[in-house]
């Protein structure tokens, strides 16, 4: 599989990762261990990836792992096509913990909270990690593949 500059740099510095290739737009995608994510995030920020374009999370498979996906952009003045990279950080379902990058990219605040609320990934050192869409009393993580929908019905007016 073809590797990009970031994957080659990580290999050179003996950082464990897995190259997942390139997407349809030519953006390199890497798989990173949760324990390495905070240091790699700092490296990316220092290199110039100063914008967290988006963050999301998904359930890989029932009984499997959860993934937190970060799309980072290197924005520079006068550059029409900024560099982008996609980082996937995987965590086991029984203890889904990933270091928060809120302290590096402030835009991770609500995005990591939404991932916590919907998928149940706990972002270590996030300053306000609590539910953002569901009520605090909600039980479970609605976007997990093993989620069981509560047995209740919405009452509607017949007007």
UniProtKB/Swiss-Prot annotation:
Pfam entry (one): Complex1_30kDa
Endpoints of the signal sequence: none
Subcellular localization(s) per the UniProt record: Plastid, Chloroplast thylakoid membrane
Reactions catalysed: a plastoquinone + NADH + (n+1) H(+)(in) = a plastoquinol + NAD(+) + n H(+)(out); a plastoquinone + NADPH + (n+1) H(+)(in) = a plastoquinol + NADP(+) + n H(+)(out)
EC number(s) stated in the UniProt entry for this protein: 7.1.1.-
GO biological process: photosynthesis, light reaction
Membrane topology field: Peripheral membrane protein
Domain of life where this protein originates: Eukaryota
GO cellular component entries: chloroplast thylakoid membrane
An MF annotation (GO) of this entry: NADH dehydrogenase (ubiquinone) activity
Family as reported in the entry's similarity comment: Belongs to the complex I 30 kDa subunit family.
Quaternary structure annotation from Swiss-Prot or TrEMBL: NDH is composed of at least 16 different subunits, 5 of which are encoded in the nucleus.
Function: NDH shuttles electrons from NAD(P)H:plastoquinone, via FMN and iron-sulfur (Fe-S) centers, to quinones in the photosynthetic chain and possibly in a chloroplast respiratory chain. The immediate electron acceptor for the enzyme in this species is believed to be plastoquinone. Couples the redox reaction to proton translocation, and thus conserves the redox energy in a proton gradient.
Annotated protein name in UniProt: NAD(P)H-quinone oxidoreductase subunit J, chloroplastic
Species the sequence originates in: Brachypodium distachyon
């Amino acid at each position: 599989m073809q590797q990009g500059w970031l994957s080659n740099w990580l290999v050179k510095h003996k950082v464990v990762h897995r190259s997942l290739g390139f997407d349809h737009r030519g953006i390199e995608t890497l798989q990173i261990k949760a324990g390495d994510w905070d240091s790699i995030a700092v490296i990316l920020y220092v290199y110039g990836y100063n914008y967290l374009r988006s963050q999301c999370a998904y359930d890989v498979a029932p009984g499997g792992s959860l993934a937190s996906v970060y799309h980072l952009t290197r924005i520079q003045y006068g550059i029409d096509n900024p560099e982008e990279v996609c980082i996937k950080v995987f965590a086991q379902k029984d203890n889904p913990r990933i270091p928060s990058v809120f302290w590096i990219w402030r835009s991770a605040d609500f995005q990591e909270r939404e991932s916590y609320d919907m998928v149940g990934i706990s972002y270590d050192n996030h300053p306000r990690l609590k539910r953002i869409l569901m009520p605090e009393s909600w039980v479970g993580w609605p976007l997990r593949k093993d989620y069981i929908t509560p047995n209740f019905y919405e009452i509607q007016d017949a007007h």
